[in-house]
């Protein structure tokens, strides 16, 4: 199945072609700088791959010439052949400072190392330093902050501490206003712009923990995408006759057409391999997959 794998690899490289051609405003570098990166090195990496090419084959045949004579001539046909190509490409390698690490070996950014994990939604922002979510404190964000015991008046009457937050309460003859902090008589008054904003701020503080975690995950995905795009870009640049940004539309169309032909050839190779795998001789002495001594 080696031929099938080689064909699929070549087709996958051409599929990245249009994505890697920079558009307007794409110049200026795409590698995102980050904290903890002490240096970036450009390494020369050997690249080995198989590429296809058209080999001319001359087929003799007889034809009718002038004077009703039979002449011998030939026609030129082409067949797809494979050859091994060895090239060198440049790749960027990031070196992290002490106390920082890469998420994976090919990452171009570094993240801080905390010997003990940051709890309750905290994020490790520097070596052994956590940035805690609202309502939590301590070196590892393991301490619940009792907002009710601070010097700031958060509730007009009663304050109840909760894990990572607090709630306000009122005496039995009063009701809690829409801001969640002020007590008032009877039914609460229609919400004002200030009270609505206050509630929105509290909701935003609660969502901050989830948002930070999502940003952290998205940064990891971006690093992996940058790595894959860099590898694919190096592969495509190695097999193209000119850099992708110098390709003309007609050249892109031609390469895309070659990709379609390669896909068709790969399907034919797979069909032949399946048929050959089902073949066997009458005495099984030379059948594929059968070894008799």
Swiss-Prot record:
Keyword rRNA processing: no
InterPro entries: Dev_Signal_Modulators, EGF-like_Ca-bd_dom, EGF-like_dom, EGF-type_Asp/Asn_hydroxyl_site, EGF_Ca-bd_CS, EMI_domain, NOTCH1_EGF-like
EMI domain location: 34-112
GO CC annotation: cell surface; extracellular region
Coiled coil: 195-232
Gene Ontology process terms (BP): vasculogenesis
Signal peptide range in chain numbering: 1-25
SUPFAM superfamilies listed in its UniProt record: EGF/Laminin
Disulphides: 38-97, 65-71, 96-110, 114-124, 118-130, 132-141, 148-159, 155-168, 170-183
Glycosylated residue positions: 50
Domain EGF-like intervals: 111-142, 144-184
Keywords: Calcium, Coiled coil, Disulfide bond, EGF-like domain, Glycoprotein, Repeat, Secreted, Signal
Cell location: Secreted
GO molecular function: calcium ion binding; signaling receptor binding
Glycoprotein as UniProt keyword: yes
Membrane-crossing segments per the record: none
SMART domains: EGF (SM00181), EGF_CA (SM00179)
Listed Pfam families: EGF, EGF_CA, EMI
PANTHER family: EGF-LIKE-DOMAIN, MULTIPLE 7, 8, EPIDERMAL GROWTH FACTOR-LIKE PROTEIN 8
Protein name, UniProt field: Epidermal growth factor-like protein 8
Species this chain originates from: Homo sapiens (Human)
Lineage: Eukaryota, Metazoa, Chordata, Craniata, Vertebrata
